């Protein structure tokens, strides 16, 4: 009888825990995805802060030339970064217990791999948690779908690209200048500016910001005033009110006359779907572009594509970009390569005699 009572008590405790985890009444929803999200993001954040402040230099290229990234080793907020795991480690899973000592683990850039893998798990779980909360509340799932765009982008630069290139040392450093270095080297090696998927991403980001500004300004300019001119129009809105807060007909009429009639949405649902889909699809394409360039399916190459009747090259902007790419490529990892890959790949002409 005692055993039966204990089993009921433990089951009751588990049920209460499940109810608490999945309760939508909590100030912050936890959810089953949150059970994994919270420890992974806390770990990634904690290690990032500690490493950004105090991590010793890392041998990123695997040639015994450590690169300093932390504040205590001479960097500031702009130049500091978590240096990627050493090329000597490659794609190997490199937890602390795989190193002979903590000093070796730090020298080989172990914190980068720890942070990145925990971070990617955490943001994926955050996306799952968005879906989970939407499901509990009876909402549609599109919030999580929208968030999948930045998740895909982060996964592309922190995981897919290193896998394609064969080493975590090719991943994006976790810092401001490190991000810029990653972008410059990526352009030099993959000509990303000439990749159509990157172009779609640019259209998505800039177009999304334009449409967001247009929508916000149109709504703010067509509010239905419920107050006198002596007080703010915002005071006329009550949270949860049933009435429309702005006049979509007026906004539609204004914009339709400013551009042309069919450039303006007259359906609020279609409008907001478009506002969400435009940047999300653009960033999806950019993440897909990074993931294909990871395996060296690079941007368009129009180098020396225009020649005169004598066979002499007439430079186009593509050739100017190519010259810049070569310059950037010879300057990065200066002591790891004798020549940029584009030059080293060309077979030398044999000399007889």
Curated annotation (Swiss-Prot):
Catalyses which reaction(s): 2 a plastoquinone + 4 hnu + 2 H2O = 2 a plastoquinol + O2
Keywords: Acetylation, Calcium, Chlorophyll, Chloroplast, Chromophore, Electron transport, Herbicide resistance, Iron, Magnesium, Manganese, Membrane, Metal-binding, Oxidoreductase, Phosphoprotein, Photosynthesis, Photosystem II, Plastid, Thylakoid, Transmembrane, Transmembrane helix, Transport
SUPFAM superfamilies named in the record: Bacterial photosystem II reaction centre, L and M subunits (SSF81483)
EC number: 1.10.3.9
Top-level taxon in the UniProt lineage: Eukaryota
Binding site for a quinone: 215, 264-265
Ranges annotated as spanning the membrane: 29-46, 118-133, 142-156, 197-218, 274-288
A molecular function GO annotation: chlorophyll binding
Sites of Phosphothreonine modification: 2
Keyword Cell inner membrane: no
Binding site for Fe cation: 215, 272
Chief site of localization: plastid
Residues where pheophytin a binds: 126
Note: 2 of the reaction center chlorophylls (ChlD1 and ChlD2) are entirely coordinated by water. Herbicides such as atrazine, BNT, diuron or ioxynil bind in the Q(B) binding site and block subsequent electron transfer.
Binding site for [CaMn4O5] cluster: 170, 189, 332-333, 342, 344
Subunit field text: PSII is composed of 1 copy each of membrane proteins PsbA, PsbB, PsbC, PsbD, PsbE, PsbF, PsbH, PsbI, PsbJ, PsbK, PsbL, PsbM, PsbT, PsbX, PsbY, PsbZ, Psb30/Ycf12, at least 3 peripheral proteins of the oxygen-evolving complex and a large number of cofactors. It forms dimeric complexes.
Function statement: Photosystem II (PSII) is a light-driven water:plastoquinone oxidoreductase that uses light energy to abstract electrons from H(2)O, generating O(2) and a proton gradient subsequently used for ATP formation. It consists of a core antenna complex that captures photons, and an electron transfer chain that converts photonic excitation into a charge separation. The D1/D2 (PsbA/PsbD) reaction center heterodimer binds P680, the primary electron donor of PSII as well as several subsequent electron acceptors.
UniProt-annotated site: Cleavage, residues: 344-345
Chain positions of site Tyrosine radical intermediate: 161
Membrane topology: Multi-pass membrane protein
Modification type N-acetylthreonine: residues: 2
Localization: Plastid, Chloroplast thylakoid membrane
Residues annotated to bind chlorophyll a ChlzD1: 118
Protein name from the UniProt record: Photosystem II protein D1
């Amino acid at each position: 009888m005692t055993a039966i009572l204990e089993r009921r008590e433990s089951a009751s405790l588990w049920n209460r825990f499940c109810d608490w985890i999945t309760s939508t009444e909590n100030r912050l929803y936890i959810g089953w995805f949150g059970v994994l999200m919270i420890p992974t993001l806390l770990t990634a954040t904690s290690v990032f802060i500690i490493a950004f402040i105090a991590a010793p230099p890392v041998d990123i290229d695997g040639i015994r030339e450590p690169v300093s990234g932390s504040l205590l080793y001479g960097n500031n907020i702009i130049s500091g970064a978590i240096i990627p795991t050493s090329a000597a480690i490659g794609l190997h899973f490199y937890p602390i217990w795989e190193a002979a000592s903590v000093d070796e683990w730090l020298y080989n850039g172990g914190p980068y791999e720890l942070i990145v893998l925990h971070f990617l798990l955490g943001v994926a779980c955050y996306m799952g948690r968005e879906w989970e909360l939407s499901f509990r509340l009876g909402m549609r799932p599109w919030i999580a779908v929208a968030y999948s765009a930045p998740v895909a982008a982060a996964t592309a630069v922190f995981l897919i690209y290193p896998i394609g290139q064969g080493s975590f040392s090719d991943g994006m450093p976790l810092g401001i200048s490190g991000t810029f270095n990653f972008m410059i080297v990526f352009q030099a090696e993959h000509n990303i500016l000439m990749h159509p998927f990157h172009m779609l991403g640019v259209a998505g980001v800039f177009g999304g910001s334009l449409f967001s500004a247009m929508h916000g300004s149109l709504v703010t300019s067509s509010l239905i005033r419920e107050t006198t001119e002596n007080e703010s129009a915002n005071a006329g809105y009550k949270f949860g009110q049933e009435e429309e807060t702005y006049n979509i007909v007026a906004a539609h009429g204004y914009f339709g006359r400013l551009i042309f009639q069919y450039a303006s949405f007259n359906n609020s649902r279609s409008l907001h779907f478009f506002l969400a889909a435009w940047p999300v699809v653009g960033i999806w394409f950019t993440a897909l572009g990074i993931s294909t360039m990871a395996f060296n399916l690079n941007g368009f190459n129009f180098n020396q594509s225009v020649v005169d009747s004598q066979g002499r090259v007439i430079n186009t902007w593509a050739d100017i970009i190519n010259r810049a790419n070569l310059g950037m490529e010879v300057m990065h990892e200066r002591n790891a390569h004798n020549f940029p890959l584009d030059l080293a790949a060309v077979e030398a002409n044999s000399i007889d005699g």
